[in-house]
């Protein structure tokens, strides 16, 4: 590569960089002398040398203590990685037999000579850094060791001085039913002949007596220390990580190895760098790290036991695979096995005994034999079958290569592959660039970068990149050592190769749990595992031969504790499941971690209906989906969610029930309901497997319990409780048989209080479950015929009442009512110890109570308290669905710990605390965010690979091409590359690994821009799920999801992707009143979240918004970063989000919806332009079961939606009656073309509204809304209406009198509004607590009734005190003094709080401090109207105005500190009593208030903001209900309140008009639009609305509406006809279009339409009257003058028709000559004008020809009549005898076709000849 003059690589004989030494020798980097790091430093001439130490013959020391040119007997490597037997000098001049990096004979860390930095002292035998012994003297004469190695004495060897060599034997192995004789080795040192007379204890004692264990003497006392000064001990000289020494290389005084265990580093007894197999000890991570071997130690050569390159009998590779006795290279390459590559020949880097990458032996990515850390499997390579390299030859999965050629085209191969695919050909000179990457030049085998072995081949070696070297055949670049010859030249090679094969067979026996050669980690701690099964055990062999589910697969990559996930499988381990399945069974479960093997339960898989041919791989004990994926817990079910039941019988559940495992938690079982079974559960999913996402576990609470492994009771949490079938019928029909449940009162007491009707109505009912919690229902509860077993489910951290929403009664009935829930045992779990945190201090530190409060608020509950002692979480709910603490809630503030796994194009996983609303599950619960697990669990990684031909990549972070945005639950789109790979049958992950190796990371771009579906989502979308691209969806949907849109969309957006059809409706249906705020709603509306939720999937209860604010209108376009569509551009099925704004849903007028997504459930497309039946479509749409994708998603649907169901007639009156009242009090101005309606000034309309609403508030469907309307109109009447008291006065009353009268009227309004609540409270408290009833009367200023009640209850002093209230101010002062005295004497502690409340009220004190540090608040538990009334009546003097009382009340609820706030906020009526917290929107100064409060503010401040007052949310929960808002605005306009902005007014007018239009009252919508001030906007809006609704077919209803528009609203009739013309044009009805255009006075358009479409048909059909009717109407000059081309078009037709009629008239009646003259003139005129008619079609030309022909005949007739024959002749007039001179000029101008023209010519010719004949006579 660099020409021959550069010699070998860095000093080797075949180096790539020269032939002379760095420091002036005759080689560049050292073919004949020491290289840069080679053996000789300054000048001796060698045969070879190199940077990394190829063999040299004359090395010299740095300081030249001995000669610079001592002869050497062998070679040495620069870093000591090769063999070295030549003599050399050490760094400090001590002679040695070979040199390396640190001047010892052997490699750098396993010296046999004194080291440069070793110990300082006497000569002794010591161990190198990695374990080999040396027996030389140190320069300072002391016993020395290697760089870090401990020293040992030179005493006579006793004990185990002879290296362990296991005796061999034979045994029988049964595989696939065939018995095979195999060789065995006895892995016990006492089995050797040398030690067969001794026991293990004796050998150990001799080792101890030989001081092979224990500290050495200090420096200068006969021994030396290591590099860091601690006392090394004699040892058997093993390595840093796998030595059997008792003192570490760093010698800190502990009797441990380098990592502190009593054994080797990674679990082997005498292992190499990373540990050869140790039989009886454990590793750093408490797992055996390899298989037991027969070696003692290795150097740094990753597999050799002696010095570099020397033969060794049995060694371990880098990761512990044993190899036979043979020389080993840097990575343990077995030089006798015709392989010499760096990464996997013999026992190379990854422990293989065969050729490099892709050979039959094993490869880096395609090993066929050896597996993970010392165990072996039989699997096919990923990129090739039997001989392919990483990118190399013969891949079966095909990347387009041919046999024996590499993919990269770097040459051809013949026998083995290097890493880049080229093979050396024996005896050849290489092939170009291909040779540069490994083709040996004259060598038999190439190593990683071209290092060759002196095997069968020519005399020349290859350089680093293929360049030839001439002086040596053993030089390497440092990644391999010179190897001994192969079988042809080495007599030991054959035996070594046989030993290697034997080792492979042994590894199969020793490793029953599989192996992955790519990522090797320590195995689990044997202390926590049962004793390993003996590999030759007949039972084990029988299990191996039983065809089951799993192939040989790796253990979990780390010591994990996977949480038990809910699944249809069982919780039992399956030790030998699937050990001998065929390769196709590996499709989904091959290289995935399996769970604990502690329990051996062999399950008959044939009993389960889960295992269809496609998805049977996905469900078993340790299916990959059961492991926590990056801390998140999901179970990918192969059946619908409602079929997630136990499938294997009671015996499995029993075993699961009593089975606990610290490693694998039992899988909670759920009962199987017979009603939920599906007949299609066995159907095969025939879609592209890689694109099918399975239905996720919808209920995160039921999926797993946090304490499953620690509490027996929690094992039952997610199963139905065992029922006691022996029970007696309750007289009231109440059923409660589940064990552990109780009621207060008890069931017996309930039976006693059952009345004679069989009804059981109990007050303050409680139902609970021992140890779990209870539910307390306040008030009277009717328990008659309630099946509490089915209704109430109290589980760990969860309570469910009414599982089925369809069976849930309305709010307030049954148990769906307000309640107080107490859940016991709610403690968080410590992430480290997995124990419950019960310490109150620690709970306070982590703010667990605050977390529970946040969870309560999120679920719509009101948090009450948390009791750490019992873990009781107490909260109140307004109605029931499901409440509880999910694992995601408990750990939402935890962040997963970082893992230090190898990165392969990774992307960081976002923290779990940034969950977005779109990640909420469809059942209303947020999808569980990632849980913070133990570090071992988190190191498990997130990739779930289910392909058989992929190696273990559980330690790999996920590829960012697999990262997907979190859809509901665990649904993600699939990357395009995955889709392509899966479609072609290629392993997607293989493709991803190739991409990661070749391509750089791509920038994250938004999906709306690059239109790809596999990129990372936006910042807000965290909580990512990473799924395997091959996860089958529900089996029940496989028959519906055939390949429809290329397979890419079907699995993503079928019903299985979101909800199973069997559960979608039942699970999602909830009463709309409870769907959002969990509060009683006053209408069919509930409080909606912000508007953005309309464009997302419907979410059932209880998704509670944290804020309740009014809708805010955006005045401009929302920035893209803040838009709800940001980052959602890839959501194909949601056309509101796909492609950003370009594909957003189009909302049209009249609530029409144009979208290209799926048609909404229940709606109909608008066909034939008829309004389809409206579907129920609330502000939040009803849940819709997603249908399978059966057509293109880009078909546009036009649908008609409505806010509610069709209204009954009486409900429609709520719309029409107030509009009629408004029209009655309005004036229509017709000064302009478009009429303008303005309200009449005055207050008369207010009284009409008030009178009407009082009558209408009876039994209407919307009684609650009308009731609020009544309060509003009566308040307007009190504030601005006529006062009867003032109307009787003749003179204008003074302002003071007006203020007092308004106060009285407002006071009466307050009393009336409080009456219903007061009556209800008095009825509840009159008997038990009359004092409370008295206070209720006082809140309505019903003082006389309060006095009477006090007297009736015997409280005469209170009655007397109440009667004085109407007196002077002195009564209040005296009461205040009395309260002060009681406070000073602390006597108030003995007075009832309710009584003190009355005293404080009468004293005018809203808040009174008691002596016991309590407060009496007179406004507590009062609505805002009564709180305001208290301020007006009791806290202010009688002369105070309304404004002053309102100001004082505002201070009561607006104080910044909670301690000073004593009154409730003026919430709208639909929110009163809901218990919800109203949070003000950030940066908003307009909190939500009641409309009545706004009216009071406007009365007090004339310039108060009208926009707040007219906001619909201040009136009703429906933000689109503008009925009252618009009428209020018109009333305020009549009162001269005109400071509403033009934009807000326009929105108000248009919104109310749209609402009326959607209800079918479009004529009243025009009435509303006629109030718009801007004439242009008004006219445009009215005309557009007319265009949408005017019908061509006249009916009595349409006629009445048109009459209303034209007569009452004075809408121009021509506008209506114009709208009809547009509709006729749309329907292609030309006749009606022309008629409507004529009526709309569009003369020109009408004429144009007639000429182009109607005239020709009329002429051809001789329908002259029809055409004449149109043309005569257009003929008047005032009209025809406005028509273009009237003279040459319409008038020609009209004259033609008139000529025909005149001729008929002349023929019927005798006419004068004047008439004939006129007719002659018209006919001759037509002859010249007919040709001017413009023809647009063949029909027009036909009509023109007919007209010309007929005109020609008319002309003859007229001329014959006008010129009769001579009187002498008796002949009658003959048209054929007309003089030619009169006829020919006109006939020639007529446009006639050829046949007509020929007839006319023939006639003219005959006339001409006749005239000639006559003239000749």
UniProtKB/Swiss-Prot annotation:
Residues 738-880 form the Peptidase S59 domain. Residues 670-682 have a biased composition (Polar residues). Changing residue 1669 to V: In a breast cancer sample; somatic mutation. Changing residue 881 to A: Loss of autoprocessing. Loss of nuclear membrane localization. The record marks 391-392 as: Breakpoint for translocation to form the NUP98-RAP1GDS1 fusion protein. Breakpoint for translocation to form the NUP98-RAP1GDS1 fusion protein. Residues 512-535, 614-633, 662-682, 886-937 are annotated as: Disordered. Isoform 1 to isoform 4 are autoproteolytically cleaved to yield Nup98 and Nup96 or Nup98 only, respectively. Cleaved Nup98 is necessary for the targeting of Nup98 to the nuclear pore and the interaction with Nup96. Transmembrane segments: none annotated. Residues 214-480 are annotated as: FG repeats 2. The modification N6-acetyllysine is found at residue 603. The record marks 531-532 as: Breakpoint for translocation to form the NUP98-KDM5A fusion protein. It is found in: Nucleus membrane; Nucleus, Nuclear pore complex; Nucleus, Nucleoplasm. It holds the Pfam family Nucleoporin2. PROSITE patterns: NUP_C. The active site is at residue 881. Part of the nuclear pore complex (NPC). Interacts directly with NUP96. Part of the Nup160 subcomplex in the nuclear pore which is composed of NUP160, NUP133, NUP107 and NUP96; this complex plays a role in RNA export and in tethering NUP98 and NUP153 to the nucleus. Interacts with RAE1. Does not interact with TPR. Interacts with NUP88. Interacts directly with NUP88 and NUP214, subunits of the cytoplasmic filaments of the NPC. Interacts (via N-terminus) with DHX9 (via DRBM, OB-fold and RGG domains); this interaction occurs in a RNA-dependent manner and stimulates DHX9-mediated ATPase activity. This is Nuclear pore complex protein Nup98-Nup96.
């Amino acid at each position: 590569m660099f020409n021959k003059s550069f010699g070998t690589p860095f000093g080797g004989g075949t180096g790539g960089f020269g032939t002379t030494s760095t420091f002036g020798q005759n080689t560049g980097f050292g073919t004949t002398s020491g290289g840069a790091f080679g053996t000789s430093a300054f000048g001796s001439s060698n045969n070879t040398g190199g940077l990394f130490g190829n063999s040299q013959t004359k090395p010299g020391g740095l300081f030249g203590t001995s000669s610079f040119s001592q002869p050497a007997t062998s070679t040495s490597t620069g870093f000591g990685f090769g063999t070295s037997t030549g003599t050399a000098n050490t760094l400090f001049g001590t002679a040695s037999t070979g040199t390396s990096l640190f001047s010892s004979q052997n490699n750098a860390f396993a010296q046999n000579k004194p080291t440069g930095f070793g110990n300082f002292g006497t000569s002794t035998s010591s161990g190198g850094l990695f374990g080999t012994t040396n027996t030389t003297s140190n320069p300072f004469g002391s016993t020395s060791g290697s760089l870090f190695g401990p020293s040992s004495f030179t005493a006579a060897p006793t004990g185990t001085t002879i290296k362990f060599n296991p005796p061999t034997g034979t045994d029988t192995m049964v595989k696939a039913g065939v018995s095979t004789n195999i060789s065995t080795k006895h892995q016990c040192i006492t089995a050797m002949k040398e030690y067969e007379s001794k026991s293990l204890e004796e050998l150990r004692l001799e080792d101890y007596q030989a001081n092979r264990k224990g500290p050495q003497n200090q420096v200068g006392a006969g021994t030396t220390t290591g590099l860091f000064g601690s006392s090394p001990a004699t040892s058997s000289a093993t390595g840093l990580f796998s030595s059997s020494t008792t003192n570490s290389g760093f010698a800190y005084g502990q009797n441990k190895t380098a990592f502190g265990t009593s054994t080797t580093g990674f679990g082997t007894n005498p292992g190499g760098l990373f540990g050869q197999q140790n039989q009886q000890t454990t590793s750093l991570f408490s797992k055996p790290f390899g298989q037991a071997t027969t070696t003692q130690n290795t150097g740094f050569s990753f597999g050799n036991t002696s010095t570099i390159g020397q033969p060794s009998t049995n060694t371990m590779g880098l990761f512990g695979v044993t190899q036979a006795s043979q020389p080993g290279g840097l990575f343990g390459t077995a030089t006798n096995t015709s392989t010499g590559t760096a990464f996997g020949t013999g026992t190379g880097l990854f422990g293989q005994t065969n050729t490099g990458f892709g050979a039959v032996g094993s490869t880096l990515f395609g090993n066929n034999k050896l597996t993970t850390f010392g165990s072996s499997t039989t699997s096919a390579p990923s990129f090739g079958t039997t001989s392919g390299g990483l990118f190399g030859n013969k891949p079966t999965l095909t990347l387009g290569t041919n046999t024996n050629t590499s993919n990269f085209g770097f040459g051809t191969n013949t026998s083995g592959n290097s890493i880049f695919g080229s093979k050396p050909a024996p005896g050849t000179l290489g092939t170009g660039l291909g040779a540069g990457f490994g083709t040996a030049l004259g060598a038999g085998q190439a190593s990683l970068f071209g290092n060759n072995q002196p095997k069968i081949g020519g005399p020349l070696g290859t350089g680093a990149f293929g360049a030839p070297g001439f002086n040596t055949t053993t030089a390497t670049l440092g990644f391999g050592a010179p190897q001994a010859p192969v079988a042809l030249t080495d007599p030991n090679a054959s035996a070594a190769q046989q030993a290697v094969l034997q080792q492979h067979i042994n590894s199969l026996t020793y490793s029953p749990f599989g192996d992955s050669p790519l990522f090797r980690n320590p195995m689990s701690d044997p202390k926590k595992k049962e004793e390993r099964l003996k590999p030759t055990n007949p039972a084990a062999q029988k299990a191996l031969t039983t065809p089951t589910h799993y192939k040989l697969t790796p253990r979990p990559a780390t010591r994990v504790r996977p949480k038990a996930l809910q699944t249809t499988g069982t919780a039992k381990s399956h030790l030998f499941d699937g050990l001998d399945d065929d390769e196709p069974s590996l499709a989904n479960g091959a290289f995935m971690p399996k769970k604990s093997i502690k329990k051996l339960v062999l399950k008959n898989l044939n009993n389960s209906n889960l295992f269809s041919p496609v998805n049977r791989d996905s469900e078993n004990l340790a299916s990959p989906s059961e492991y926590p994926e990056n801390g998140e817990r999901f179970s990918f079910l192969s059946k619908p969610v409602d079929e997630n039941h136990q499938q294997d019988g009671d015996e499995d559940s029993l075993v699961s029930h009593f089975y606990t495992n610290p490693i694998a938690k039992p899988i909670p079982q759920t009962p199987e309901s017979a009603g939920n079974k599906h007949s299609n559960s066995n159907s095969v999913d025939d879609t592209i497997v890689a694109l099918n996402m399975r239905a996720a576990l919808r209920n995160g609470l039921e999926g797993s319990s946090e304490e499953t492994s620690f509490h027996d009771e929690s094992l039952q949490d997610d199963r139905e409780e065992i029922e006691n079938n022996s029970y007696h019928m309750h007289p009231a029909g109440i059923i409660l048989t589940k064990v552990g449940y109780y009621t207060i009162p008890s069931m017996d007491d309930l039976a006693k209080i059952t009345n004679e009707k069989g009804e059981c109505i109990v007050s303050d009912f409680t139902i609970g479950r021992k140890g779990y919690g209870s539910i307390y229902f306040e008030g009277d509860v009717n328990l008659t015929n309630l099946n509490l077993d089915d209704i109430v489910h109290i589980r760990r951290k969860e309570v469910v009442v009414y599982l089925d929403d369809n069976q849930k009664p309305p709010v307030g009935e049954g148990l769906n009512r307000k309640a107080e829930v107490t859940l016991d045992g709610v403690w968080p779990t410590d992430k480290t110890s997995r124990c419950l945190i019960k310490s109150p201090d620690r709970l306070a530190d982590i703010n667990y109570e605050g977390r529970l409060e946040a969870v309560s608020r999120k679920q719509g509950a009101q948090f009450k308290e948390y009791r750490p002692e019992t873990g009781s979480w107490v909260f109140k709910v307004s109605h029931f669905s499901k409440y509880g603490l999910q694992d995601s809630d408990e750990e939402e503030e935890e962040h997963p710990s970082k893992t230090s796994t190898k990165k392969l194009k990774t992307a960081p996983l976002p923290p779990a605390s940034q969950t977005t609303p779109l990640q909420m599950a469809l059942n209303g619960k947020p999808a569980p965010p990632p849980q913070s697990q133990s570090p071992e669990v988190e190191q498990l990684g997130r990739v779930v690979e289910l392909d058989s031909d992929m190696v273990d990549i559980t330690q790999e972070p996920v590829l960012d091409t697999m990262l997907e945005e979190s859809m509901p639950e665990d649904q993600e789109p699939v990357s395009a590359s995955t889709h392509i790979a899966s479609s072609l049958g290629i392993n997607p992950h293989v493709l991803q690994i190739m991409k990661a190796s070749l391509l750089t990371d791509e920038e994250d771009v938004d999906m709306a821009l690059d239109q790809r579906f596999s990129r990372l989502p936006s910042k807000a979308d965290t909580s990512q799920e990473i799924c395997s691209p091959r996860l089958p969806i529900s089996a029940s949907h496989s028959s519906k999801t055939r390949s429809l849109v290329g397979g890419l969309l079907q699995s993503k957006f079928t019903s299985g992707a979101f909800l199973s059809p069997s559960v979608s409706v039942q699970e999602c249906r909830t009463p709309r009143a409870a769907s959002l705020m969990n509060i009683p709603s006053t209408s069919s509306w509930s409080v909606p979240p912000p508007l953005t939720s309309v464009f997302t999937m419907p979410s059932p209860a209880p998704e509670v918004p944290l804020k309740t604010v009014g809708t805010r209108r955006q005045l401009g376009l929302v920035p893209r970063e803040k838009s709800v569509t940001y980052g959602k551009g890839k959501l194909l099925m949601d056309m509101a989000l796909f492609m950003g704004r370009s594909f957003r849903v189009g909302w049209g007028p009249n609530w029409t919806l144009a979208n290209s997504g799926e048609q909404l459930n229940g709606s109909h497309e608008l066909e034939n332009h008829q309004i389809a039946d409206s579907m129920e479509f609330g502000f939040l749409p009803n849940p819709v079961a997603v249908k399978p994708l059966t057509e293109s998603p880009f078909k546009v649907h036009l649908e008609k939606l409505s806010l509610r169901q069709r209204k009954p007639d009486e409900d429609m009156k709520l719309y029409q009656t107030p509009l009629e009242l408004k029209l009655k009090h309005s004036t229509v101005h017709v000064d302009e073309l478009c009429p303008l309606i303005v309200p009449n000034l005055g207050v008369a309309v207010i009284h009409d509204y008030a009178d009407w609403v009082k009558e209408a508030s009876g039994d209407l469907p919307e009684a609650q809304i009308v009731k609020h309307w009544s309060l509003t109109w009566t308040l307007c009447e009190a504030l601005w209406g006529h006062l009867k008291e003032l109307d009787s006065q003749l003179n204008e009353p003074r302002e003071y009198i007006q203020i007092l009268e308004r106060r009285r009227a407002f006071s009466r309004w307050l009393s009336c509004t409080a009456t219903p609540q007061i009556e209800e409270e008095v009825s509840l408290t009159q008997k038990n607590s009359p004092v409370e009833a008295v206070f209720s009367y006082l809140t309505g200023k019903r003082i006389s009734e309060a006095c009477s009640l006090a007297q009736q209850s015997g409280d005469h002093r209170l009655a007397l005190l109440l009667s004085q209230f109407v007196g002077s101010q002195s009564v209040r002062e005296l009461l205040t003094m009395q309260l002060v005295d009681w406070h000073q004497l602390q006597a108030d502690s003995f007075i009832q709080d309710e009584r003190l409340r009355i005293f404080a009220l009468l004293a005018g004190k809203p808040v009174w401090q008691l002596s016991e540090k309590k407060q009496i608040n007179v406004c507590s538990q009062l609505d805002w109207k009564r709180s305001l009334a208290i301020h007006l009546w009791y806290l202010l003097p009688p002369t105070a105005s309304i404004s002053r009382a309102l100001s004082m009340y505002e201070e009561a609820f607006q104080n910044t500190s909670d301690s000073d706030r004593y009154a409730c906020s003026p919430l709208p009526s639909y929110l009163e009593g809901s218990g919800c917290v109203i949070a003000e929107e950030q940066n908003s100064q307009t909190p939500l208030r009641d409309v009545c409060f706004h009216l009071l503010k406007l009365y007090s401040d004339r310039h108060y903001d009208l926009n707040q007052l007219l906001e619909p949310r201040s009136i009703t929960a429906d933000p689109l209900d503008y009925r009252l808002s618009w009428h209020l605005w018109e009333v305020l306009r009549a009162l001269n309140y005109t400071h509403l902005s033009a934009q807000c007014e326009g929105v108000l007018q248009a919104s109310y008009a749209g609402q009326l239009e959607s209800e079918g009252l479009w004529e009243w919508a025009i009435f509303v639009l006629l109030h718009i001030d801007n004439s242009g906007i008004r006219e445009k809006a009215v005309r557009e609305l007319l265009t949408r609704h005017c019908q061509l077919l006249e009916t009595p209803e349409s006629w009445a509406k048109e009459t209303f528009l034209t007569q009452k609203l004075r809408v121009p009739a021509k506008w209506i006809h114009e709208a009809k013309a547009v509709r006729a044009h749309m329907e292609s009805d030309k006749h009606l279009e022309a008629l409507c255009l004529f009526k709309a006075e569009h003369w020109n358009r009408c004429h144009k339409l007639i000429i182009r479409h109607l005239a020709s048909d009329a002429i051809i059909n001789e329908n002259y009257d029809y055409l004449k009717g149109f043309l005569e109407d257009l003929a008047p000059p005032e009209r025809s003058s406005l028509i273009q081309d009237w003279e040459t078009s319409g008038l020609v037709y009209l004259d033609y028709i008139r000529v025909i009629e005149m001729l008929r008239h002349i023929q019927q009646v005798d006419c004068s000559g004047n008439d004939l003259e006129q007719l002659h003139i018209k006919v001759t005129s037509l002859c010249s004008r007919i040709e001017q008619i413009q023809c647009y079609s063949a029909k027009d030309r036909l009509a023109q020809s007919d007209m010309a022909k007929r005109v020609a005949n008319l002309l003859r007739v007229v001329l014959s009549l006008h010129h009769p024959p001579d009187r002498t002749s008796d002949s009658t007039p003959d048209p054929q005898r007309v003089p030619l001179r009169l006829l020919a000029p006109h006939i020639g101008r007529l446009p006639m076709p050829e046949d007509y023209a020929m007839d006319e010519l023939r006639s003219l010719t005959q006339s001409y000849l006749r005239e000639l004949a006559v003239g000749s006579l």
